């Protein structure tokens, strides 16, 4: 069957273009045009330190490293995600073009969480 439009996170297309799962994926991905809405939703990645962690200082150092340009690039490169703004992107991701993140905050997501779960349940998702 043919499909005119699909919605997918950009990093799946980037993985295909890079041939992570083989040459065939790369050939299919070359037929796809990535369009980014403006503004675009951004998946949230977060880290934290457990209240009773015995190694809090080391955990904080790890989080600080992951939030640094070097750590961000190390996280983003193999997964084809967008790194921090001041870090060079993977070329495939860079070729998708610039985007403006939407203004949704973590607080917004928390406020709408119960409604989202209700909608999913009402639609038959388990």
Which residues does each PLM region occupy?
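Extracellular/periplasmic catalytic domains that process cell-envelope and extracellular macromolecules
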Residues: 25-28, 40-42, 54-57
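Stable alpha-helical elements in mature extracytoplasmic
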Residues: 12, 55-59, 71, 92, ...
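An extracytoplasmic/periplasmic, membrane-proximal ligand-sensing/linker region
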Residues: 84-126
